[in-house]
């Protein structure tokens, strides 16, 4: 395959001293660490929408992207050419996985029946490519936000007809995701929220959202879909206030509606910062609650208040992210999906490779640093010592449940002189830098 990216050869690992921009400097997919290859540890995935569908249009300007597969008039012809381009790209960058929305891979028709027919045609084409490609599907999902019918939401819409249409669309998306591989299925509620409470029945909307997800669970069981269900938190954009605000919010929702046994979370870095959390905070909260399923790997611009979906190149961020993944024991069905797009001014097809190379190298380097941090127990040792007071005496009584307010008051009256120790944040940040900058 050498039709759409003929100026780019297969991307290979050449090491950090290479001056070849079309090579990996830190990501060697065959390198073995702790019994697994880097490819197995990182499980990189390409986002179909940003990579092959996005055209560079923004609120202030027209499309800028030079995409040779878009030089057709019939939407189905474009969809077929995109599949060809996608698998050429996957092959050249050696991608283990890709992710898609239903409307990324096939255009909508005039009716739902026609739309489903379009999907069947493209899915059959993708299945043919999957027979000979190493690339598999990490997850699929349904686009329940772009079409004007979703102006008031999908499963949380005030219009029951929209709820029904959304259910039909997810039904089909589940079927094709199962047909293409069934690792995971993602729910992202871009329109599931509100602009003002003056016209919103929040209780009904949340109840309906839960009803919708239970229906999805039931149908997945019916068709034998064995993939992991994931919810992707995001606090806002396009909706002012979205119901899947952050990991804590999603977890509370899942537990309230008895859905926590079926769902984990897919955490996106830029969504975390939009919720005013560190990326690591969201990963840590998910990890300690056993719901960290997968990651959308990107970053945002800290000076902008919207989802910029940039390729992640900050080694500190990738290190702390992979620290949480390693502490979790690694990915099961999840992975690192590059929900990232080249900048509007990076419009040449070759830029797609350069962006992904940058992100893959950044996470590979981050993984290696994180692995050493975990192996050396740098932070674990400090944290264990910092909380040592809970290992014996009154602290042990608190943890075991033996203590109560009366016994704690008695202890406090007898030990009125409290001595705290420094948190040593600056030292720990310096140690982190030592690991980051070590050869």
Swiss-Prot record:
GO cellular component terms listed in the entry, alphabetical order: cytoplasm
Biological processes annotated in GO: D-xylose metabolic process
EC number: 5.3.1.5
UniProt xrefs under SUPFAM superfamilies: Xylose isomerase-like
Entry keyword Cytoplasm: yes
Similarity section: Belongs to the xylose isomerase family.
Protein name: Xylose isomerase
Catalytic activity field: alpha-D-xylose = alpha-D-xylulofuranose
Subcellular location: Cytoplasm
One of the record's GO molecular function terms: magnesium ion binding
Swiss-Prot/TrEMBL cofactor(s): Mg(2+)
UniProt organism field: Thermoanaerobacterium saccharolyticum
InterPro entries attached to this UniProt entry: Xyl_isomerase-like_sf (IPR036237), Xyl_isomerase-like_TIM-brl (IPR013022), Xylose_isom_bac (IPR013452), Xylose_isomerase (IPR001998)
Primary location recorded for the protein, binned into one broad class: cytoplasm
Keywords for this protein: Carbohydrate metabolism, Cytoplasm, Isomerase, Magnesium, Metal-binding, Xylose metabolism
Subunit text: Homotetramer.
Residues that span the membrane, as ranges: none
Binding note for cofactor: Binds 2 magnesium ions per subunit.
Amino-acid positions noted as binding Mg(2+) 2 in the UniProt annotation, renumbered to this chain: 268, 271, 307, 309
Catalytic residues (positions): 101, 104
Keyword 4Fe-4S: no
Binding site for Mg(2+) 1: 232, 268, 296, 339
